[in-house]
């Protein structure tokens, strides 16, 4: 679901330093997929250990998360639970797309097409249960808060933000706004110079901030109407949306008729084009399956032995680099906790 066109006027670049001392609830799966897609060898294949196991996600979680904490930010990684039944069509679509990419990847390898290899290697990326569990284990060893969502991780991260347990939710997807996040930060874990897909061009990617209240005020709508706009153009629960309706048309329709049902009643949208349950999908965004976290939401001291065991002994990471990372992490945690404490005190004066 891409609301990009209608958030353009309210999103702004935000420096990591502006988030110093603040907690950010991060959609873990979304972030790990970013690492798997972005952290690659020159030929486009992911980083692997001596046993052929993918390690791109661990590399990203370790080194890039350290950089985030060095900026004074306290990350909270939120992992997916069981997805809603309504998401099964989208999950199946993604599975087919990956299978197709895998076929094209093998063909590109046989033909020695390196640009195509890189392209399809990224498209074919998969996140296994083992990779998820290792990610949780690494984050825990690093002293970073981990929350297990009952349902969608993105919904839980947004909920944590909506009840002020974090300053913002972080994800590449705009769904966080539909789930009620007050603030959404994009590009927090992938900022810096990045190569454009299939091009020898590098661009500077910077974190972006979108505030829900500012967006709704700018558009002259409420959150439920924003959800209806998303439903019309397609969400994870109705991937195809309504044929022929883009985001600007959807905005015009909802502003004129207030909701999808009224637009159907007035003949603006043909009922025959609606092959999904509007109310059920709307409900999944308004009242998603979430819980108030019982997990620790503070940074803790890292466990050096467990980090070395997982990265160096199990996955062949360079020991000197990891030890250097651990020293950076220890210092960053100490400073981030100090900044958070001072930020909290400043609010009283």
Swiss-Prot record:
UniProt-listed InterPro entries: 5-3_exonuclease (IPR002421), 5-3_exonuclease_C_sf (IPR036279), Flap_endonuc (IPR023426), Flap_endonuc_arc (IPR019973), HhH2 (IPR008918), PIN-like_dom_sf (IPR029060), XPG-I_dom (IPR006086), XPG/Rad2 (IPR006084)
Keyword tags: DNA damage, DNA repair, DNA replication, Endonuclease, Exonuclease, Hydrolase, Magnesium, Metal-binding, Nuclease
Upper classification of the organism: Archaea, Thermoproteota, Thermoprotei, Sulfolobales, Sulfolobaceae
Listed SUPFAM superfamilies: 5' to 3' exonuclease, C-terminal subdomain, PIN domain-like
Subunit structure: Interacts with PCNA. PCNA stimulates the nuclease activity without altering cleavage specificity.
Residues binding Mg(2+) 2, per UniProt: 173, 175, 236
Gene Ontology biological process terms from the UniProt entry: DNA repair; DNA replication, removal of RNA primer
Binding, Mg(2+) 1: 27, 80, 152, 154
Cofactor note: Binds 2 magnesium ions per subunit. They probably participate in the reaction catalyzed by the enzyme. May bind an additional third magnesium ion after substrate binding.
Any GO molecular function: 5'-3' exonuclease activity
Enzyme Commission (EC) number: 3.1.-.-
Cofactor names: Mg(2+)
Name listed for the protein in its UniProt record: Flap endonuclease 1
Region feature Interaction with PCNA, mapped onto this chain: 341-349
Organism of this sequence: Sulfolobus acidocaldarius (strain ATCC 33909 / DSM 639 / JCM 8929 / NBRC 15157 / NCIMB 11770)
